[in-house]
Amino acid sequence: MLDKIPNAEEMTALIGQSLYDIWNKLCALIDEKYDMECLWNKGGKAWTYEYKYRRGGKTLCALYARENCVGFMIILGKDEQLKFDTDKTYHDGKWLMFEPTDTSMFQDFIKLLGIKRKPNKK
């Protein structure tokens, strides 16, 4: 858990205006389809911040931020792996990390999220 959630100015300084726009568009797209709890955390060794979408104790996906870079991660559990079987498997599932620089993959991200969990907003 973070002591202080980064504001727009801090995020823009970290990742740049164009990536901050991508971040906001991706968040808006997820928020449009899913009603989730959103949690800010430290980003571990590789990232400055983590912004996680969770519901019922399960993570849907997470966005990550570090200097001049945005990450989008989906972890597919065993059930989802039956539908998707090409990446390395870790103890808690397959970790798919993307580093979007534009919106071109957003519809693919939504399809992957749909494999993990059906949208709960109409």
Predicted regions and their residues:
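Short, conserved beta-strand/beta-arch hydrophobic-aromatic motifs that form part
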Residues: N24, N41-K94
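Well-ordered alpha/beta subsegment
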Residues: T86-K122
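Generic solvent-exposed, charged/amphipathic alpha-helical segments
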Residues: C27-D31, G114
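Residue-level signal for secondary-structure boundary elements
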Residues: W23, C38, K121-K122
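Charged, well-structured alpha/beta interaction segments
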Residues: D31-K42
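Charge-rich, low-complexity N-terminal segments
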Residues: M1-A28, G44
